[in-house]
Amino acid sequence: MKNLLGSSVKDLENVALEYGQAAFRGRQIHNWIYNYRNKKKSIDQIEALPLDFRKKLKDDGFKLSELSVQERNLANDGTLKLLLSANDNESIECVGIPTEKRLTACLSSQVGCPMDCKFCATGKEGLKRSLKASEILDQILFIENEMNRKVTNIVFMGMGEPLLNIDDLLVSIRSINKDFQISQRKITVSTVAVPKMINKLSAKSFQILGNCQFTLAISLHASNQKIRETIIPSAKNYEIENIIEDCKQYVRDTGRRVSFEYLMLSGVNDKLEHANELSNLLRGFQCHVNLIQYNQIDEVEFQRTSLKSLQSFQSRLSHNGIAVSLRKSRGLDKNAACGQLRQNANHQ
């Protein structure tokens, strides 16, 4: 299988030359994929190419897509969740989140997830495999084709732990930036935090991308190690203080502030003492806290914190000098919101 999605202009020019074609034929393929964002996903439909060239590419196994739409779910607020099927019959979920001026694509980086966060549906079925860069990028094209508009923002907040698929993650970010023409500053990578991988992310970003301008979002969800271990089992391998130190180094290396995701769970992490503890943990470096309301999933007994507690928590962080905002959930009625994605069509 040779997927052309994610290939650079130079790569595609080389493909053309290998088949005895002029280099500009490679640029025509690139334009077909990225500039036109064409719904025609077969090599033999690239009308700008000579028929015999198209046939040879197809016969030799070249493809523009390895995914197909298995299911569509449109929420009342316009959010679209797609269940995509890969060649190996594994399922991938992605979400298109529209506003008047933006279309945000929430992308998956793995089939399933190994982190087993207790509040998240994705990890309930474990990790099947990591996605190839082409499969990550194809999610953008499917969202664009289904919603008939171009994606403007990217969040890696779908299925999987992005830093456990770091090479394909960064290759896809490079293509999103260079080929899809989406600024790195409009890309967010969310991670539950994996030992040594925050430092590796900044180093490999400079190596593969030449810089590191996307936003790093840490799924912290706790103000101390004890609470974090109860809701995120993998936290036992990565002390919360070490995460913060690695984030401070990340800021020094990249010049970019870090975002911290904080899921408000009633009676677990939503008291004012937790807000004060979180303030002490984060004080003194460039960061921002996103408070997230819990979205109910099956088989989990956590409850959403009250609006009063949420507002008090937000006010306390702000009073303590911590930049904070409340992230609005989208697509709740179709299980397309934060923490609700899973690979099984039976859970729609």
From Swiss-Prot:
UniProt keyword annotations, A-Z: 4Fe-4S, Cytoplasm, Disulfide bond, Iron, Iron-sulfur, Metal-binding, Methyltransferase, rRNA processing, S-adenosyl-L-methionine, Transferase, tRNA processing
Pfam families xrefs: Fer4_12, Radical_SAM, RlmN_N
Annotated cofactor note: Binds 1 [4Fe-4S] cluster. The cluster is coordinated with 3 cysteines and an exchangeable S-adenosyl-L-methionine.
Disulphide-bonded residues: C106-C338
Location relative to the cell: Cytoplasm
Record EC number: 2.1.1.192
Enzyme superclass (EC): transferase
Function, in words: Specifically methylates position 2 of adenine 2503 in 23S rRNA and position 2 of adenine 37 in tRNAs.
Name of the protein described by the UniProt record: Probable dual-specificity RNA methyltransferase RlmN
Organism: Prochlorococcus marinus (strain MIT 9215)
Gene that encodes it: rlmN
